[in-house]
A protein has these predicted regions:
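Polybasic/polar functional segments that serve as interface/processing modules
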Residues: 1-117
Length: 117
């Protein structure tokens, strides 16, 4: 059984990824291009030009897991202007999986408690 509760780091590979790549090819992208190491606390997301499907690469402690999601309709709101790895918050990851942009203009910023007069 896959246990994603240990994931703390949600990375997306901005720009386009060749979706023909499988586990070994995506591991090479993570390690050689982005100089990152796969572990049980990180998941790496990749998206192709069509933006209707993503691949997620994860290390579960015993081997690599490759997840694939294809939308029936619509497209993912994927950052295209950068060729780097971007770290997402858990909330940004949820937004992405729900089809929203990871940059929400109307989201409330975390604040500090005020004083009552």
């Amino acid at each position: 059984m896959l246990d994603f509760s240990r994931i703390q780091n949600y990375y997306i590979a901005c720009g386009y990824t060749d979706m023909r790549k499988q586990i070994d090819g995506l591991v090479a992208v993570v390690e050689l291009q982005f100089r990152q190491k796969l572990d049980e606390t990180s998941i790496f997301l990749f998206c192709g030009r069509r933006a209707d499907r993503i691949k997620a690469l994860y290390w579960d402690g015993t081997g690599y897991v490759l997840l694939y999601k294809r939308l029936a309709e619509k497209r993912f709101q994927w950052p295209r202007n950068e060729q780097e790895l971007k770290l997402l918050t858990k909330q940004e990851f949820r937004w992405l999986m729900e089809g929203l942009s990871i940059i929400q203009k109307k989201a409330f910023e975390p604040g500090k408690p005020g004083t009552v007069c």
